[in-house]
Swiss-Prot record:
The chain crosses the membrane at residues 21-41, 77-97, 119-138, 150-170, 187-207, 255-277, 297-317, 368-388, 392-412, 481-501, 520-540, 868-888, 912-932, 1004-1024, 1026-1046, 1116-1136, 1147-1167. This is ABC-type transporter FGSG_00046. It is found in: Cell membrane. Residues 595-821, 1210-1441 form the ABC transporter domain. It comes from Gibberella zeae (strain ATCC MYA-4620 / CBS 123657 / FGSC 9075 / NRRL 31084 / PH-1) (Wheat head blight fungus). Keywords: ATP-binding, Cell membrane, Membrane, Nucleotide-binding, Transmembrane, Transmembrane helix, Transport.
Amino acid sequence: MDNTIGPRVDPSIRAFDFTALFEECFLDILPWSLFLLMLLVRLKFLLNRPKIIRVDRLCLIKEALWTLYAVVKLAQLILWASIAAFTTAGTVPAAALAFVGCMGGSVLSYFEHCRSRRPSSLLGILTLLILLCDVTRVRTMWLMDQPRAISILTTAALPINILLLVFESLTKTAVANEKEASRSKEEIVGILNRSVFWWLNSLFILGRKHVLHMGNLPRVDSKVLTSYAAPKVYERWESKPQSLMLQSLQAYPMTLLRGGLCRLFTALFVTSQPLLLKRTIRWFSEPSTPVSDAEGYGLIGAYLVVYGGRAVFTALAQHQNYRLITMIRASLVSLIYDRTLTLDLVEAKESAALTLMSTDVERIGQGLQFVHEIWATPAEFGVAIFLLQREVALGSLAPVIIIIVAIVGTVLLSMKIDPHQKEWIGAIERRIGSTTDMLRNMRGVKMSGFEDALTSILQAMRVEEVNISRATKLLFIGCQVFSTATATISPVLGFTIYVLMQRAQGKPGLASSSAFTSLSLFSILSSSVYIFLTSVPAIFSGISCFARVENYLVSENITGPTDAEGQDSEASSISAEKISIIAPKIAPSDYLLVIRDGSVRWKGQEKAVLSQINLCIEQGSFCVISGSVGSGKSSLLYAILGEASLKADTFHISTTSIAYCQQSPWLPDISVKECVLNGRDWDEDLYKRVIHACALSEDLAQLSAGDHTKVGYEGGTLSGGQRQRVALARALYSRRRLLLLDDTFSALDPKTEKSVSGNLFSSSGLLRELGTTVICTTGKPGNSNKYADYTLDLNKEGEAQLRNTQKDMQDDEIEASTYSREQNGPKKQEEDANHESNQSPETSQEHELAQESVPTFSSMIFYLRSTGMGFFALSFSLSLVYSFWQNFPTIWVNLWTQHDAKHPYGDLAKYIGVYILCAVLALVTHTVVTWFVNMACNGIDGAAVRAGPTRDTPENSGTASITGRGYVVFTNKHRAPMSYFESVDIGTITNHFSQDMEKVDLEIPLTGVQALFAFTSALVQLVMLSIGTKWMAITFPFIIAILAIIQRQYLKTSRQLRLLDLEAKSPLYSHFTETLSGLATIRAFGTHKQCQSINTERLDCSQGPFYLLYCAQRWLTLVLNLVIGAMAILMMGVTIKLRGSTGAGYIGLAFVNLTTFSQSIQSLLTWWTMMEASIGAVHRVQQFEKETPQEDVLGQVTSPPHSWPKAGLIELKELSASYLSSVSPVLRNVTFTVQPGQKVGICGRTGSGKTSLILCLQRMIKINSGSILIDGLNTSHVPAKTLRERLICIPQDALIFNGTVRLNLDPQSSFTDKQLQDNLRRVELWDLISSKGGLDATMQDGLLSHGQLQLFCLSRVLQKKSPIVILDEVSSSADEESQRLISKIIREDFKDRTVISIAHRLQQIADFDIILVFSQGQLVEQGSPEDLLGRDVSLFQDLFSQQDK
C-alpha cells in the first residue's frame, strides 16, 4: 500500500497517515525540485552583484550546518540504496534530490550572505517548508515497519533543519560599507521576520519606554521614500502622460503582484473554513474509534494551518497594499509639486495644489486600500456560492439575485459620486484657499479689524461645504445599505427556498451539518459582498481624485515670450538688421535684451497691458522703468521672466542668468543668512560685501540672533524695508548677469535708499563692478534714477518711450559711504570666517511636539461630548440591537434543526417568519444607525458652524458636533496674539484646516459607524460562542486579558505615530504654501531643484510616521487574527473532549460564531485603523482649543462704550514693547501725545520701530511697560478685537484675499454697491475695475498693480466711521500723481480725524501738524515739519534733504 500515490494509507496498516510514495513525491521531490530550479535563477542574479557583506562567524556557522545537513542526507541516500526491500519508486530519487539540494543550499547560502543585504528569502522558505515536511516524514518513519537507522537519521535531520532555519533568518551585521549599515530594519531582516512583523517589536518597545519623535523614529524602507518611488511614476508619466491611475499602478508591478498573491492565499484559507466546519460537525456526529480520534487531532492541525495561514497572509496582503499606497503617495505629491513649479501665476492663486496633495491624495489612498478586494471578493463569493449550491441546492439562487441587485445598485450610486465629490472637493478647495489667504495675511487682517468678518465668511464657506457634502454621504450610505441587505436577507431566503423545495420533493428537511455549513458560507458570502460593495464607492472616489490630479498635471504650463509668429525666440535668432532699427550705433553682440514692437497681456485677459514696447538694453547698463500707477511696469518685468505673455516682432535675451526682486519680497521661513545664500556655496568675502552694500549691517546687529535669525513666514519678523533689502542681498549674492528690481526701494527711508543706491549703482558700486545689467521699476523719482543709463517711460495707455538719461556721476560728500571692497561687514559675520556650510543650525521642535500628550481615551470622550452623550448612547443602543438581530438567527437555526430532526417540517411558518422578522429588523436598524450617525452629525455640524466662535464652557459643552466645533476652534485662532502666528508654522495651521477637517468631517462618521457595528457584533458573538461551547466561556477572561495587553502595547505606540504623522505633514504644507506665493522668484533664480530637494526631504520626513503607522496596524491585524486562530484550535480541542456529551448543532453554532467573530474582528480592525488618524485629529482639536493662547485674558478687559473713541486723543507714556518676552525691546520709553484731529507723520530709518509703534497701538505686540491711552481709556483694558475694529488702519502690504472686488472692499457687508462704487471713483479706480467686471470681478494677479492696490485699500475705509486713522506707508508703491491723490484724500476725507501716517516719502507728510522721528526704537525728535527743518542739526532735516537729492 505504501508504493501507491494514495494519498491516504489503508487504516488497517497505519491510522490516519499518508502513503510513503505520496510523501516522497510531494514532501521531498517536489519542494527540492522547485528549490533547485529557483537556485539557478537566483545564483545568476547574485553573481552580477558586488560583495557588500564580509565573511564572518555567521557565514561560517551556516556553511557548517549545510555541510552537516548534506552529510546526513548522503547517509540516508546510502542506506536507502542498500535496503531496496523497504523502498518505493520514489525513495532513492527523493534522497538523491535532497542531497543535491543541500549542496546547492550551501553554495547559495554563501553568495546570499556576501551579496545580499538581507537573509535569503529562498533559503528561509525552503528550510521552513522542509521542516514541516520532515515532521510528517518522521512520524511516518517511526510508524512504518523498517530499519530503525532510517528513522534515526530522518529524526537527526530535524534539529539541523531547525538550526538552519534560525541562522538563515538572522540579520547580518558585518556590512562592508556605510551605506548598507544605514538601512532600515525592514530592509535587512529575513522573510519570516517580515512575515510576522517581528522587526516592529523594537518600535513598540521604544514607544512604550520613550516618547517618539522624528529624531528617534526608526528608518523606513528606502523603497517607500521619494527618491525611489517618485521616479517610477515620473518616468512613465513623462513618456506617456495619460491615465495617471494606470501609470501609477504599473510603476510598482512587484508590489502589486505580491499583494495580489497574498490576497489569493487569503481567499483560499477563507473559503476553506466552511469545508473544515462541515468536516468537524460530521466528525463530531460519528462514533468514537481510534481512527476517528486520530482524525480529530488531525483537525486541530488543519485549524492551525487554515487560521494561521489566514492570519499571516491577511496581514501580508494588507502590508503590500499599504506599501503601494505609501509609494503612490510619494510619487503623486512629488508630481503635484513639480507641476506647481511650472504653474501660471494666475492659476497659483486658486490653491488647487494644496487640496490635491492633501484631500485628493488621501482619498486616493482610501480607494487603493481595496485595490485587491475588487477582484478577490468576487472570487470568494463565487466559490462560496458554488459550495452553497452543494448544501442548499436552488436556495443558493437567492444570494445570487440579491448580490446582482446590490452590485448594480452600488455601481449606479457610485457613478453618481464623482460629480458630487468634485463639487465637494471644489468647496474644500475654496475654503482652504480663503483660509490660507487669511493666515498668510493675518497681520493685515488684524490691523484692518477684519477678524470677525473674514471668520464669518470662512464659516459660511464651511456651512456651504457641509451642505454640499450631504449628497456624497447619502450615496455612501446607500451603498452600505445594499451591502448590508446581502448579509441580512440572503440566508433567510436561501433557507426558505431550500426547505420549501425539499418538502415539495418529499426529502428530509434542514440537517444540522448543512445548516451550519451554509451559515458559514452565507457569512463568508455576505462579508465578501460587503467588502466589495464598500470598496466600489471608495475606488470610484479614488478614480475621481486621480482624474483631478491628472487634469492638474496636464494643464497648460507658463509660456515664455514669443515672436509675432508664435515661435520661441532664441538669442541666436535675432538679426543685426532688426536691432539696428532701434539702436543703429551699437553692435548686436553688445545687447543683453532687445524687444521690438512688443505687447504684454495676462492669461485670461484679452486686452494687452502694454503695447508697442521697444527696448534695447546694453550689457552692464542700468535701465529704470518709470510710469504711473497701473501703467504696466511690473507686468513688463513679468513678461521678461516669462510669467506674462509677451509677443513681439523681435525678442532677444542673451542670458538665462537672471535675478529678481519682486515688489512684495518673497522670503521663505529660514534664517537671514540662508535667505541670502539661497542654496549657493558659502563665499565669506562676497557675503560681507553684499550685506554692507544693502546696508544690513546695522539691522543684523539689532536682531537677537544676528543673521541666524529666522525671517518668519513671509518675512514677518522683519520690517518692510528689511525684507526688501534681504531680498536684494539674495539677488546680489547670486551674481547673475541680469537683475530685475520691481520697485525694490519703495519701503526704504531716504537715507537708507541713498546709501544702498550709491553702494550698488555708482561708478564704484557693486553692480557696476560685477558688470550686472539692471532693470529697475519705480513709480517715483529716487536716488537710484540719477545713476540710470536708460529710462523707459510708460503711460497709462500701456505705451512706452525709451530715452537716454543724462547722468551726473559726480559723487557728493554723502556718497563717501559708497561701497568699498575693504569695508567690513557686521561683527556677526566676522565670527563666521571659517564657515563652511550655508546651513545654519536650527532648533528642532519635533521633540517638543512629541512630548505633547497623545490621543487617549479622553480624546474619544471629547468627541462624544461634542456630539452629545445622548447621541452616542442612542447610536450604541441601536447598533447593539442591530447586532442582536443580525446574529440571533444562528441560535434560531440551531433550534430549527433540532425541532426539525424530531418533527420534520413542524412549525415551519413560525421558524421562517421569525427568521424573516430578524432580517428585516436588522436591515432597518442598520440603515437607521448609518443615516443617523452620518447625516445627524452633518446637521449638527452646520448648526455648530453657524453658531459662530465659542470656547468650551460648561454651558455649551456637548452642544455641537466635533466637526462644527473643531472648525470654530480653528477659526478662533484669529483671537490668538500675533506672536503666535509668527512662531507657529503656517503649514501646521493649514494642516488643521485641510487634513484634520477632512478626517473629522468625513472619516469619523463613515468609519466610526462601521467600527461600532463590528464592535457590538463581536460582543454578541462572544456571548453566542459561550452558548455553543460553555467550556469556552472559561477562557474568555484570559482572552480578554491577552487582548488588553495587546491593546496597551499597540496603542501606546500607535497614538504617538498618529500624532507624528499629522505633525510631519505641516512642514510639507508650509513648503507648498511658500512655493505658491514665491513662484516668480523661484523660477527667476532657477532654484527649482533646490525647492524640489526641500520638498523631497519634507515628504520623506512625513513618509516615515505615515508608513510606520500602517505597519503597526498590520502588526495588530496579525496578532489579533492569531488570537482568533488560537481560539479556534482551543475550541477544537474542547470539542474533542466534549464529543458525545453535547449535540452537533451546538458545536456548529460555536464554530459559525467563531467564523463571524473573526470577520467582526477583521472588520473592526479595518475600520478602527482607518479611524485612528481621525482620532488623532480630534486630539488636535482638543489640544488647540486648550493650548492656543488668547490675546484677551478673562477679567482683565472690559468692553468700552459704543461711542468710544469719540475725540481721537492718543497718549503714550513711557512705552516699551517687544515682539516676544525673550527678545530685546523694539520700542524704548516712547512718550508723546496726539491731540484730536492732528495729523502726525512718523519717519525714520527702516527697522527703527515705526511699524512696531502702530502694532502697539493695536495691541499686536507685547507691551513691557508704560501705557497707551485713547480718549483717556487704557487700551490694555480694551478687548484687542474691539480696539482694532474701532480704529481705521491700512497696513503696509495691501490686504487682498480670494473673492470678488465687492468682498475685498466690504468684507463686513456694511455698505451698498453705490457707496462702494463712489469710494472707487474717489480713488480713480472705478473706470478700470468696471471695465473688468465691476464689483463682481475676481481679484487676481494682473487686475490691479501694487500702487493701485494701495489706492484700493484706501477706498475700503472711506465710508468707515472712526476718529482715528492709521496709515502704514500707504503710498510706498504710488507714483507722484497717486501720492497727490492720497494727500488730497487725507486732507479732505480725514480732515476732522486724528491721522497717524508712516512715510518714507517725506513730502507726503511735509504738511502734517507733528513729525515723530524714530531711531533704534526710540523717539529721537518730535515737532512740526517747519520746526524740524529749521534746526541746525536735525535727523528729519537730514532725511528730507537726502530724499530731494
